[in-house]
Amino acid sequence: MDHKYKVGGYVKLAKLWERSKDAAVAYHSSYYVEKFRDDADKRLVGVYIDITGNKEIYKRPEMVHLLKDCKNGSVNLIFSQTRAYLAANTCDFCFLLQYLFDMSMRVDIVTDDDDQRIDTI
């Protein structure tokens, strides 16, 4: 089956989750598998989970990994439960958008945020 979207699920958790890392990774991985299990247009490529106190995008290894996968064409849809997982502030979020827009291929962003719909960007 050929899927239109290759999804990378992203989660950024606070450093305090380090103690419960295995449970957090299992929960979020399961969330994304269930979310895209029966979606004919989307195939889950991977779940990228940062557990860190670092707010800057370049200091989050899994976010950097996700962006590299976007750049090489492995991922063309970033899905996050909330915009806050993607960037700590508006400046970082704009940097992320500019980086994605400058790529040669289209990469979309979708969140589950009910009050902050960014999936039309």
Cite the ranges covered by each PLM segment:
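Short, structured surface patches at the beginning of a domain
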Residues: 1-121
